[in-house]
Each structure stands twice: as structure tokens, then as C-alpha cells.
């Protein structure tokens, strides 16, 4: 299997483990983008704790699942999103208003769409979680 993207593979592994009812999942390789994405998911309660394991290669992450995640995914290519267009993207990607988050990478870091709107920053769209 060819790797489309490290983040896409990690989120796909989380989705598959969640569907099969697993309590934890091992992600490898790891990257800073994956860790920041997981921090946003953890902040909103979609996953439990996660631990980075340094194996002197690319690293591994063990994620504890809590059963609250319905779906998470990557948007590829990473489209530029202006502040005014965030609402359109949330309407397209999320199943309902006030349900789930679109995750963006901005100049102020990786954050969800509500935080980006509060901080008044735009950026590129990474993915979604609900």
C-alpha cells in the first residue's frame, strides 16, 4: 500500500479502530502535524490520552479511544480558507450545525474552525472530526 499522506493514514487507522470497537490504536509513523491534530481532538473529547513513543526512527503514537468519535478525515489538497469561507466549509463537511469541527492549519498553529474565527485567522484546511 502506498502512503497517500501520513496524516490520512493515521486518521484512517483511528477510524477503523473506532469502528471495530478497539480501546487503543498504534499510529506509525508520527509527525508534528498528527500530534497537533490529536491535541485538538483530545481537547474536544473525541479521543482519550495519547502517548508519543520515541523509537529513534519516525516515532509511534498510542491513542486511547473513548467511543465518542463518529468519523475523522483529511481534506486533500489542503485548500486555502478565508475567514468568510469557513462557514461554507463547515456546512459541506459536517453533518449538522454545532456538531463536529473542521481543523485548520493557520499562522497561529493548528486549531479548529471556531478558535480560528475567534482569533480572526485564516489558513489551509487539514481535515474534520465529528
Swiss-Prot record:
Q: Which InterPro entries match?
A: Ribosomal_uS8, Ribosomal_uS8_CS, Ribosomal_uS8_sf
- Its domain of life? Eukaryota
Q: Which SUPFAM superfamilies has this protein been placed in?
A: Ribosomal protein S8
Secretion signal: which residues? none
Which cell locations does it reside in? Cytoplasm
Presence of keyword Ribonucleoprotein: yes
Q: Which UniProt keywords apply?
A: Cytoplasm, Ribonucleoprotein, Ribosomal protein
Q: Where is this chain primarily localised? A: cytoplasm
GO MF = structural constituent of ribosome
Q: Name one GO biological process term.
A: cytoplasmic translation
Assigned GO CC terms: cytosol; cytosolic small ribosomal subunit
Question: What HAMAP family does the entry give?
Answer: Ribosomal_uS8_A
Provide the assembly information.
Answer: Component of the small ribosomal subunit (SSU). Mature yeast ribosomes consist of a small (40S) and a large (60S) subunit. The 40S small subunit contains 1 molecule of ribosomal RNA (18S rRNA) and 33 different proteins (encoded by 57 genes). The large 60S subunit contains 3 rRNA molecules (25S, 5.8S and 5S rRNA) and 46 different proteins (encoded by 81 genes).
Q: Which family does it belong to?
A: Belongs to the universal ribosomal protein uS8 family.
Q: What does this protein do?
A: Component of the ribosome, a large ribonucleoprotein complex responsible for the synthesis of proteins in the cell. The small ribosomal subunit (SSU) binds messenger RNAs (mRNAs) and translates the encoded message by selecting cognate aminoacyl-transfer RNA (tRNA) molecules. The large subunit (LSU) contains the ribosomal catalytic site termed the peptidyl transferase center (PTC), which catalyzes the formation of peptide bonds, thereby polymerizing the amino acids delivered by tRNAs into a polypeptide chain.
Q: What else is known?
A: Present with 19700 molecules/cell in log phase SD medium. There are 2 genes for uS8 in yeast.
Protein name (database record): Small ribosomal subunit protein uS8B
Question: Source species, please?
Answer: Saccharomyces cerevisiae (strain ATCC 204508 / S288c) (Baker's yeast)
Name of the gene encoding the protein in the UniProt record? RPS22B
